[in-house]
Amino acid sequence: MATEEIDMSYWDVSWGEFNEDKNSSIFCESHPHIVNSHGIWEVMTFKRGMNFWEYPLPNLEILIFSTFFIWRLLDISFNKIGLRVPRFTYMMIAGIILGQTCHFSNKSWIHDIFFPDDNRPKVAETLGAFGFVLYWFLKGVTMDAELPFRTEKRSSVIGFITVIIPLICGSLTFRYRERRGDSSILRMEYRLIIFLQSISAFTSIDTLLKDLQIKHSEFGRIALSGAMVTDMLAFGVTFFNAIYYEKLYGFMQTVGFCLFVVVMICVVRPAMYWVIKQTPEGRPVKDFYLYSIFGIAFACFTFFNKVIHLFGPAGSFVFGLTVPNGYPLGTTLIQKFESFNLGSILPLFGSLTMMQVDLLRLFKESGDLIRMEGQIYEVISFILLVNTTKFVVTTITAYAFKMPLRDSFALALVLSNKGIFELAYYTYAVELKLIRPEVFTILAAYTLLNSIFIPMLLELVHDPTKRFRCYRKRNLGILKDGAALQCLMCVYRPDHITSMTDLLETFSPSQDSPMACNILHLVELVGQANPMFISHQLQKPEPGSTSLSDNVIISFRGFQRQFFEYTSLDIFTSVSVSQHMHEDICWLALSRSLSLIVLPFHRTWSVDRSTVISNDDNLRMLNVNVLRRAPCSVGIFVYRKPIVESHMAKSHSKICLIFNGGKDDREALAITNRMRLTEKRTRLTIIRFIPKSSEMDNDEWEQQQSINLKESVTSIVGSNIKENDAKVTYIDKAVSDGSETSRILRAMANDYDLFIVGSGSGIGTEATSGISEWTEFNELGPIGDLLASHEYPSSASVLVVQKQVYIHHTKSQRRKSF
């Protein structure tokens, strides 16, 4: 095979410990060789040698600094004007800028730095490829490996259709063009375009959602679940094609991959959990384990690349899936490697890849797009056809599953996004000579434009402030009889432990009313420590030490022992700054599909209510943030003790429900009814405040309206509250303004152990007229604020309930439903 001769006259290679043969076709290194120069004046001092940028280390440093400076400058500038684009897009743009700068100064030293005309090893390209493999591994670590098995029907169908329909459409179009016989694109190039434009790569979607800060949302979960389904289909299509086209060799590839997955599941995954159990609670994972995992990740890359001849980074990604995400192992790996990789190494991959794009050629051929001819028109038109099909079918499918039209558009945009995976695979295909450089230029340019404009369009159609809102109902009102109550109890201070356990006891779990309790201990982050999210089911304290959540664990385990047959209990600790605690609460509720979050009230008083013991503004802000963003119903619990009397064998628990018929009151009724499903003797009083009529006296009016109250309550909760139940009392009170409401509530202050009320109860009616303006704590609503106030003469506890706000679609496309 003939060897191409390369002009080496520019380089004084012998000075840098390099050698070349007589015709300059073979380039060798002498080891150990010099990696850096003798100084910037080397040529002037020694009258020979190389410029300092010609040595490997300075050249690498210049490339790293150049790419970092440009992409960070773009990132800061775009953020200043309010345009949020994935960071990898800026890295690609940096490559375009550097590449075109070098092309315009073809004979200058700038061109020699970025495009050295020699056969020396490309250190920067190798390091960039290393960064890409590390990036794929870390993406696997951040992903929940069990997500595909928990994917709901909606995400599975969306993921399936968004791949299959574009694949079919693209294949039919390709066959039509092939029959015409005038195609300038090779068969393999067509197959590659169809495949990569039809799938939605998880890594690209995850990067987009993370950089736009909508990953931890119901919308983000659907998008990631759909992307994961497309990835699984992509693996299936890959191996089907391998077996179909390459017969035995393809079959051996498939077998090798299956064996690899079996080893990951049966050997590596249990080993990861063993590492977690060896790590004491609150302590970092040993460096030995971290670097061993790091080494195995690149061994998996080698196995895929050299043994079964598949896309190498996919091996590191699959291995990353075996690492349990979250604290301590997954979080530690991310904290240790991600920032360095994204800041220094990965930009080399994005920039150096895009530097190979021949932008001048694209501009010269752009006229062919208008004339609808030529190679560029054929590629772009085919890409647009496949992507338009993908966008339309995704939108229709999402809308058919009751997603709002705007969110259906947004989901279609997300699943149509192209980014780091597609660019890497195009580069891989060029190396394997599956596609030609001129086609690569078109595909890379399209990928760049796609990654710029889709995030901008997404900003227009998607509202990120509602990222924790759900598309499905998650509240107590929809729970069927016998269904477990999925709840989250939050503990901020030690005195909240007793209040939350007492409230749980009022539910008294039974066979007809089981509970799945999740306890979250909130610890404020101080100093320079890293945030942590600890699952006490997986991690145990170091022998001889205690956990910072010991009191929480012991107390709630005691509650579980009381009702062990009908209660499951999971305890977590979140250590974070107070400004972000609400995100941990909402994300835990979202990820575990909970129906109720219970938060402690931020103010507590002495037993005689004469002084305020604590008034924590941080806790109040936490409660407000959760109420605004919660994916399910929320209760704020004001603890004032008498609720504990309900556990006494001979006593009745006296509960008062204030029911004015609003959405929050209906949820409060559902919670109250849940408490009545227990075996305990509970006396319930349901009070409703109605407008006073001038045509009849109060007693006659209230007696007539109490019948309607019974019918309303029975219609909401069904047969659980019987019409003639002696333990349920219905009271209608006619009022003309809020002062009468206050007087009535004060008169019954000492008659009950627990008051339950909706946060929106009575708003806009005579019941709250005149007192709404004096509300101190708006999150409780006017009646809840009255019951929780310092002046209210009662020692009864108060539970204020807000029903879930969920996103749905109707014919009028309203964004919220109650």
Swiss-Prot record:
The keyword Lyase belongs to this UniProt entry's keyword annotation: no
Keyword entries, A-Z: Antiport, Ion transport, Membrane, Potassium, Potassium transport, Transmembrane, Transmembrane helix, Transport
GO annotation, cellular component aspect: membrane
Major site of localization recorded for this protein: membrane
A Pfam family of this chain: Na_H_Exchanger
Top-rank lineage group of the source organism: Eukaryota
Membrane topology of the entry: Multi-pass membrane protein
Tissue spec: Preferentially expressed in pollen.
Molecular function in Gene Ontology: antiporter activity
Ranges in coiled-coil conformation: none
InterPro entries hit by this protein: Cation/H_exchanger_TM (IPR006153), CPA2_transporter (IPR050794), Na+/solute_symporter_sf (IPR038770)
TM helices/strands, residue ranges: 51-71, 88-110, 123-143, 156-176, 192-212, 222-242, 248-268, 288-308, 310-330, 340-360, 376-396, 409-429, 438-458
GO biological process: monoatomic cation transport; potassium ion transport; proton transmembrane transport
Annotated compartments: Membrane
Function field: May operate as a cation/H(+) antiporter.
PANTHER family in alphabetical order: CATION/H + ANTIPORTER, CATION_H(+) ANTIPORTER 6A-RELATED
Family to which this protein belongs: Belongs to the monovalent cation:proton antiporter 2 (CPA2) transporter (TC 2.A.37) family. CHX (TC 2.A.37.4) subfamily.
Protein name: Cation/H(+) antiporter 6A
Organism encoding this protein: Arabidopsis thaliana (Mouse-ear cress)
